[in-house]
Amino acid sequence: MTDTLKWDDHVKHLASSCYGVLAALRKIKNYTNYHLRKHLVECLVLSRLDFNDIIFYPITDCLLKRLQRIQFAAASFVFGRYVNNIDSILKLGWLPMKERREWHILKAAHKAIYSHDWPRNLQLEQVRHARNLRSSSTINLFIFHASDTFQHSAAALFNSLPSNVKCCDNFKSFSKQTLCILKERCRNRAE
């Protein structure tokens, strides 16, 4: 992050680091099978892309495309051929970068709502109804006017989920359900 609050340098360094790892992995690709290549990429490349990605959550489309190109390069290494479409990413069981980052925001929002270990000063503000309504049984988060904040991003994404998913207090089940929802959104977007 620069003094102008832009993430260009961070993404540039991240891209350089990931492409360096992929260059090193290409030297051993003839000695590895598909599953090992996939595991190596998930551990050495995708983990770098995922690390603290919710901190710089809404980023410009240009930077998001750079991150997506890194993921395409990683998928190309795994498949052993050129990859530039979302369908190939989904075949690997991965989410594209936009949805992957949204999934991490949703998981953090779930922890903020349901986890007792979440710091009290970082709690997400929920909508409280003055009267008892049928819609008050589902959880909705308050969306602040200030965008580019965790509260705003998490609330916008969390409120768009179906009510049965929002009310799920089991983290593992919530993660699986949101993963399926986001994969379905990717498939619909690709068509």
Where are these regions (language model features)?
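Hydrophobic/basic alpha-helical segments
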Residues: 1-191
